[in-house]
Each structure stands twice: as C-alpha cells, then as structure tokens.
C-alpha cells in the first residue's frame, strides 16, 4: 500500500499555499512539481500541515488545520495531528479519530489560517 506523504504551508510573501516537503527546521517547503529542479519557498512554519491521506466527499485532500462539516451538522470540526494520528475536534474538544468518520459525509469548508472567522463561529 502506497501512502502519499505531503505537506502544505503558506508562503511568507504573498500568502500562497505551497505543497511539497518541508526542510528539517520547517522554515521552507520544496515544491516537487518539477522533480528536475524543485523550487524552495519560505513559509510560515505555523501554517505547515500534513496531508491525512484522507479525501472529503468532493475528493479534496484533508490536511491538519482544515475545517469541515460532517453531513447535515451545522457545527464545524477542526483537523489536528496529535499523538501520531489525525483527530477531529469540536468546540475545542476531541470528537474522534478522523479515519473513523464516514468520509462520504465530510466536506472541507476552509482552514484555520485562511478562515479565522470560522474559528470564532466554532467556539461560540
């Protein structure tokens, strides 16, 4: 079984999302779109998140830091990577392991970096 190991991070200049592998100090990400000459981007280390290897119902990759809805629930869940696994948090409390939820009902609606206003709604 082949697992895709992928990270994302937001560039310090421009705030663009870069996908690839981070350096050991999590200050840069190598974008591996061009394997002959990968580009290296300085990123905000707080925004670096690991791909969970799980896709939502729209075939969108789910990363640590993403926010999602679960079915018809109005609440938003946050994805965190802790203790070696991806966890779903609801209103700041652990709800469950991401891989145990029915992904056909998960829809990523944003992330904690681009959509901080959604965090306020989550925690109210």
Where are these regions (language model features)?
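Secondary-structure transition motif
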Residues: 1-124
């Amino acid at each position: 079984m082949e697992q895709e190991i992928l990270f994302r991070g937001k560039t310090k200049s421009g705030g663009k999302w870069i996908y690839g592998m981070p350096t050991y100090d999590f200050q840069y990400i190598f974008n591996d779109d061009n394997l002959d000459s990968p580009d290296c981007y300085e990123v905000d280390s707080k925004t670096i998140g690991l791909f969970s290897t799980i896709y939502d119902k729209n075939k969108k990759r789910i990363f640590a830091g993403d926010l999602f809805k679960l079915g018809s629930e109005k609440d938003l869940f946050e994805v965190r990577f802790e203790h070696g696994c991806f966890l779903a948090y609801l209103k700041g409390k652990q709800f469950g392991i991401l891989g145990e939820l029915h992904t056909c009902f998960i829809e990523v609606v944003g992330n904690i970096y681009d959509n901080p206003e959604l965090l306020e709604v989550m925690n109210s």
